[in-house]
Amino acid sequence: MTPEHLPTEQYEAQLAEKVVRLQSMMAPFSDLVPEVFRSPVSHYRMRAEFRIWHDGDDLYHIIFDQQTKSRIRVDSFPAASELINQLMTAMIAGVRNNPILRHKLFQIDYLTTLRNQAVVSLLYHKKLDDEWRQQAEALRDALRAQNLNVHLIGRATKTKIALDQDYIDERLPIAGKEMIYRQVENSFTQPNAAMNIQMLEWALDVTKGSKGDLLELYCGNGNFSLALARNFDRVLATEIAKPSVAAAQYNIAANHIDNVQIIRMAAEEFTQAMNGVREFNRLQGIDLKSYQCETIFVDPPRSGLDSETEKMVQAYPRILYISCNPETLCKNLETLSQTHKVERLALFDQFPYTHHMECGVLLTAK
């Protein structure tokens, strides 16, 4: 695979290899055949980041080869949304001959939605001033004249200039209901929107008929919490990043959801609070003991769950675990399988043509 060519004819073979690999990794814990969720074969990534290479009068997007570290010119990127591909061409054309916009530009980040909204961030090794803003506004207007629904942002050290706004609102059809998700630039969002829809619908399916409340750690912008709220009496969710918490609060209101409470704290701190190890001012007015959480949902970073959180989640009758790294999932399962058994197993092909696998497991207490 090269950045400008996807081996779409190999899609089925690479997916089959992942299924075999996941089954092999999960064999010590389950003999289930994974439920398999396919990605679109191209244009599946809703966000992408590129370094910008200056070559005389020319400049272009590049990425670095992960093995050799050599740079690779990228003029089109079929893994990314069609809108990102349009914007890549339009941004280079708009910046190339503009000395103010191109000077010390070193990176461009793209974030798009299924409804063709975009936020494009230009990153600089220089101070941004009013002259930069004027030129950026002219570029934005020129892009919009091409029917590109785009918001531009300039970034430099300790500086962020959003010409209009620094977010876009994604709308996803989830099990017969449209969900609105505010996505803020430079914050985590699920990169593959089609796969995100399938993950959310799978999570809804495996939690059908749930009793009591749901606890979620690492909730981000509320991606899972809000979709799952319809299956539970109440949802209590934690997140540490301020922009994500703000987006989650917006999403709660935008979706008219009244049974989700977001707390800004790390999973490790929340574990301490739940265990009564220490008190937190941020929890004033929230009666943790009033929640009857029968299910806990975790979607941890690649490092997986730390040992304290492992112990904490074992206290819950049901654990729903979405993993972006099956190796750390299996490491966690060495502990979790002492008290819980795997009831459902899913493979989500988040990043086709790569080694990467995303998977989901539902665990129930033995």
Swiss-Prot record:
**Reaction(s) this enzyme catalyzes, per UniProt:** uridine(54) in tRNA + S-adenosyl-L-methionine = 5-methyluridine(54) in tRNA + S-adenosyl-L-homocysteine + H(+); uridine(341) in tmRNA + S-adenosyl-L-methionine = 5-methyluridine(341) in tmRNA + S-adenosyl-L-homocysteine + H(+)
Which Pfam families does the entry mention? tRNA_U5-meth_tr (PF05958)
Q: Which InterPro entries does the record match to this protein?
A: MeTrfase_TrmA_AS, MeTrfase_TrmA_CS, SAM-dependent_MTases_sf, TrmA_MeTrfase, U5_MeTrfase_fam
Amino acids binding S-adenosyl-L-methionine: 190, 218, 223, 239, 299
- Is S-adenosyl-L-methionine a UniProt keyword of this protein? yes
Query: What GO terms fall under cellular component here?
Result: cytosol
Could you name the active-site residues? 324, 358
Disulfide-bonded cysteines: none
Q: Which UniProt keywords apply?
A: Methyltransferase, S-adenosyl-L-methionine, Transferase, tRNA processing
Enzyme nomenclature, EC number: 2.1.1.-, 2.1.1.35
The protein's matches in Gene3D superfamilies, at most eight in alphabetical order, are given as: 2.40.50.1070, Vaccinia Virus protein VP39
Signal sequence segment: none
GO biological processes: tRNA methylation
Q: What class of enzyme is it?
A: transferase
PROSITE patterns in the record: SAM_MT_RNA_M5U, TRMA_1, TRMA_2
Asked whether the keyword Transport is assigned, the reply is: no
Q: Which GO terms describe its molecular function?
A: rRNA binding; tRNA (uracil(54)-C5)-methyltransferase activity, S-adenosyl methionine-dependent; tRNA binding
| Record-stated family | Belongs to the class I-like SAM-binding methyltransferase superfamily. RNA M5U methyltransferase family. TrmA subfamily.
Q: Please describe what this protein does.
A: Dual-specificity methyltransferase that catalyzes the formation of 5-methyluridine at position 54 (m5U54) in all tRNAs, and that of position 341 (m5U341) in tmRNA (transfer-mRNA).
Record's protein name? tRNA/tmRNA (uracil-C(5))-methyltransferase
User: Which organism is this entry from?
Assistant: Escherichia coli O6:H1 (strain CFT073 / ATCC 700928 / UPEC)
